[in-house]
Structures are given as C-alpha cells and as structure tokens.
C-alpha cells in the first residue's frame, strides 16, 4: 500500500495532472464497469419471470455479478473493509483532487475517527482488515489478509496545513505513513504560445509508453513471473546487495537526525518511517518497470 498526499493550489491543474496519470486506469475501470452493467442486466432478466421460490433458487445458483470498481473518491473504511472481507476486492484506491472531501468527511469526524485511523494504519502496515458483527449478524463478520489500499489525495495548502497540525492525525501515525509532495507552482509560466499549441499529450511518446505499460499491467491475462516468489498471490521482489546498502545508509541517516537537537527531533513519527516508505516506493517502481 502507498499513501500519497500532494499540495496544489486552486488552478494548479491538479485534476488535469491526475487524469493524465490515471488515464489507463480510468479507461480500464470504465470498460470493466460496462461489462458489469451488462452482466447485471442479464442476471436480472434471468429471474424476472420467476416466482419467489424459483427466484431464490436462481439467486443461490447464479449469484449476482460484483461491481468491479476499485477507484473511489469518497468511501468509508467500514464500506471498503466490507468489500475486502467479502472477497470482492483485493486492491482499492481512494483518490481525490479535493483532499478536503476526505479530511472533512464522515470517517474523519465524530466517534468513528480514531477507530478508522487505526484501521487505515493496520491496513497499511499488515494488509489486514477485520469486521466484527453482533451474534445475530455473524454473516457480516470476517477478515481479509494481504489486501492493498492506495490513497492519492491532492489539496490546497490551507487544507493540508490544518491536517498536518492535527495532533490526532500525527500522533496516531496516520499522516506519517503518507508521502507528501509539494511540486513547484507553475502559475504565470503556462503561456499558450506557439510551442504550447504544437504539443499534444496524446502523441507524446513518453506518455504513450507510460500508458501502454499501465495497460499491460492492467490486463487480466496471467503473466509468468517465475523469478519472483509468490506470497498469497502477490509477488515479492527481494532487494539485491546494492539496494540493501543504500537502504541501510538511508535508514541510519534519518535515525541520527532524530536525535536531540537534530533536524527531525520533533518529527520522529515521520522520519522513522522514511526508510520503509522509500522501500515501498522503490518496489512499486521496480515492478512497474
């Protein structure tokens, strides 16, 4: 799992950049959803003329298709945990170019907040979620292992600043699990001159190569990966010796900087996770390539 947070002011093209980065995923999700809608209509048609008893038998022998969506802009932990526990999803993403929608949403307010933060932390660390129901509703209880969740939130400085000052979001380790980026604001330089007008993202060879790779990885056809160990259906990519040495030096550098009077003395929750986050990001890049 990766939790990503990006700062960008209103008008900084947050939506444009995210749509460009997620283009292949969005198109894939749309195709899958159209197939799901057709399957659902067929399923409904199959039981439309049946009586109640036959309809129950039909539903038992032909369960309805599941919504294949994995991208969400606003979903509660309770809902996403249910999708994991029920085996509908193994991977999901909460992505929004309005981070205020998440930080100001139902999950982050009221009595459920601390429980949700703990759940997100557990999901990040162990890929584990648990749902417990009352004895009268045991069918709703269950666990899911080795699941993944990606946060990809973008928001204005004012929104992220308030979140980063929140002692609960910091103290419970929720925000320290995020990778924060603050890209340069290009406002004032984005002139639509002749050079700009001659460019087309859809014909840029770099973007085409990126989208093509995304499409390949999204393809459901199995790809042999015999050189990597499988762990519950997920590939484990080991670090070579050079990577281990780089990781060790990186870890020790950040550990020393957490000492008294050092740069990260008061940011230990963030600094202590730097090495882990770097390993996760490197693994995603290695797998993508």
Where on the chain are the PLM-derived regions?
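Conserved ASCE/P-loop NTPase catalytic core
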Residues: 2-150, 154-163
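Phosphate-sensing "switch" segment of ASCE/P-loop ATPases
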Residues: 31-33, 38-41, 45-48, 122, ...
């Amino acid at each position: 799992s990766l939790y990503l947070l990006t700062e960008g002011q209103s008008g900084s093209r947050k939506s444009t950049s995210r749509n460009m980065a997620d283009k292949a995923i969005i198109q894939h999700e749309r195709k899958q959803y159209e197939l799901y809608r057709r399957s659902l209509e067929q399923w409904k048609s199959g039981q439309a003329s049946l009586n109640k008893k036959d309809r129950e038998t039909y539903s038992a022998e032909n369960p309805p298709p599941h919504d294949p969506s994995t991208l969400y802009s606003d979903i509660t932990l309770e809902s996403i945990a249910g999708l994991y526990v029920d085996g509908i999803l193994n991977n999901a993403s909460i992505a929004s170019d309005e981070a205020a929608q998440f930080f100001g949403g139902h999950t982050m307010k009221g009595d459920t907040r601390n429980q949700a933060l703990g759940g997100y932390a557990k999901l990040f660390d162990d890929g584990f979620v648990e749902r417990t129901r009352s004895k009268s509703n045991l069918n709703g209880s269950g666990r899911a292992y080795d699941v993944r969740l990606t946060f990809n939130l973008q928001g204005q400085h004012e929104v992220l600043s308030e979140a980063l000052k929140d002692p609960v979001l910091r103290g419970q380790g929720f925000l320290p699990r995020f990778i924060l980026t603050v890209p340069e604001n290009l406002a004032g330089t984005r002139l639509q001159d002749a050079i700009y007008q001659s460019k087309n993202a859809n014909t840029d060879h770099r973007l085409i190569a990126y989208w093509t790779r995304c499409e390949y990885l999204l393809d459901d056809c199995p790809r042999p990966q015999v050189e990597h160990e499988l762990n519950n259906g997920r590939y484990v990519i080991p670090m070579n010796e050079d990577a281990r040495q780089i990781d060790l030096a990186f870890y020790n550098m950040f550990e020393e900087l957490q000492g008294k009077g050092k740069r990260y003395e008061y940011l230990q929750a963030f600094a202590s996770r730097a090495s882990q986050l770097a390993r996760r990001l490197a693994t995603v890049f290695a797998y993508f390539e």
